[in-house]
Amino acid sequence: MQPEQQVMLNQVWAELIIEELVRNGVKHICIAPGSRSTPLTLAASEHALLSIHTHFDERGLGFLALGIAKASNDPVAVIVTSGTAVANLLPSVAESGLTKEKLVLLTADRPVELINCGANQAINQQGIFSSHVCHSLQLPSPSQNVPAQWLLSRLDQACFVQQEQGGAIHINCPFPEPFYGKKDDSLLVDYLAPIQNWKADTSSYIQQTPYFSHVTLSPNWMQTARKKGVVIIGKVSLEEANCAAQLAKELGWPVLADPQSGYYSEWAHYDLWLQNSACFELLSEVECVLQFGARLVSKRLGAWLKNYQQAYYLIDPHSELLNESCHAHVRYRADISTWCQTHADSLADRDCVFDHAPSVHWSESLKVASQNALALARSMACNSETLSELSFALTVGQKANDCDWFVGNSLIVRLLDMTGELNQKNVYTNRGASGIDGLVATAVGVQLANDKPLLALVGDTSLLYDLNSLALLKQATQPMVVVVMNNDGGGIFDLLPVNEKKKDDFYRMPHQLEFSHAAAMFGLSYHRPETLSCAMSMINDGLEKGIHLIEINTPAGQSGEELTRLFQTIQHAALF
């Protein structure tokens, strides 16, 4: 094949790939630099309907795409060059495989004749993401012997699998050189002739209709509704959480809402009060659990569920197993909002009047327990000006201005679960694999998708791990505040039953670093408050304008000591 023909074929295939992805719902593409990916990069950059995002670090790029997909609920494409650039996407792909954000991984590759022969920047990219993707497509090198219809069909099938299952798809694209040259459409007129109707249209080449099961009323629903039950809300959207809470209200059941849901109920702080044996036993009187979504932060609620042996219903739109305790249960794969609405309507349609008297006493007692547990936590946080991780978690949900939230996987997410008041907030997390990598990049992706002010809470080790992604903050389209809780290492390990020397050496790993120079290097406004009120003022001022890094320094081990005292007090208190 003549060089000019290969240039054209590379470019035409890349254009077909990008166009068909757009027709399948892709609106954002995240691109890292590289020569082998030139055909894809040029095709994406010239597409009028795409928003383009760039980053020099492929690991951060993958998490940026994850954040955009998380907030937009759309598939997001990622373009990287060959070699370890591809391998750096694995952490974000592993997360999306568990939490089902739709990533489309377009990885440029060497042609087959340059694999396993000592060629530069060539690794075996086929199957590199293993079971972490829902579908893999290994393309041949662009050739006139492979019809354009074949390419479009395979792309559509990959997108359809993703639409049905969620998660990432991997499309490996081996482009032979050359990549650069003048475009001459006349060279491929005959090759493109069979898809002229597709080119004149705006629909995908193959149009498949996904299977949506109609939500029907659960068997024995009216008997279930008369039981003493509890609604557990896991990692769901705020809209879904509100629908689940409304159903609970119709049933007269308490709501235990995970902070990731953005919903705050009167029975909150259960990760505290479930440490009290009387509360644990009282909750165990329930006869039915309705759980919406999974990925619960609370270990105590997880322990209670492990001991629970009665009727258990789990509702989630995805098909993977979400039952770590291996309970016998009824699983509904359904849209959560629709399921809740259908079952709530059935109660109204039948004009049901339930006798909630048997449930009132224990439900009200747990409500009182929640209030008293929170009061004990507040008393443990000393005075109103003390700035600690505990006092911050107790306050930030109430005092922070309206914005989106991104909460990292450090001690802060557990403190918010225990003591926070995140009510009617859009809360985003990476609680699938729950890694500490890529948190800043994911937060930026969420902000870009929603175009709203965002508050991100991360730990010091997490920020050190994703320091490169501070460069992405300049892409934010609205005010953004990153709060780093600096307890000099892995404070989340403070409660481990390990001697202090080994705990420091192998778990906390103190670093004695602070982040003012990092903020300066990336051109960020930096603040270091000394009091709680000052911290809240800085956060709220930052959410009005600009991009800010706020560092909250607390002594190493302080949170562990406070929590140990609090847990001991909770365990022996009369909470109701």
UniProtKB/Swiss-Prot annotation:
Reactions catalysed according to its record: isochorismate + 2-oxoglutarate + H(+) = 5-enolpyruvoyl-6-hydroxy-2-succinyl-cyclohex-3-ene-1-carboxylate + CO2
InterPro entries: DHS-like_NAD/FAD-binding_dom, MenaQ_synth_MenD, MenD_middle, THDP-binding, Thiamin_PyroP_enz_TPP-bd_dom, TPP_enzyme_TPP-bd
Note describing how the cofactor binds: Binds 1 thiamine pyrophosphate per subunit.
Pathway participation: Quinol/quinone metabolism; 1,4-dihydroxy-2-naphthoate biosynthesis; 1,4-dihydroxy-2-naphthoate from chorismate: step 2/7; Quinol/quinone metabolism; menaquinone biosynthesis
KW Transcription (keyword) present: no
EC number: 2.2.1.9
Subunit comment: Homodimer.
HAMAP family given in the database record: MenD
Protein name per UniProt: 2-succinyl-5-enolpyruvyl-6-hydroxy-3-cyclohexene-1-carboxylate synthase
Organism whose genome encodes this protein: Aliivibrio fischeri (strain ATCC 700601 / ES114)
Protein encoded by which gene: menD
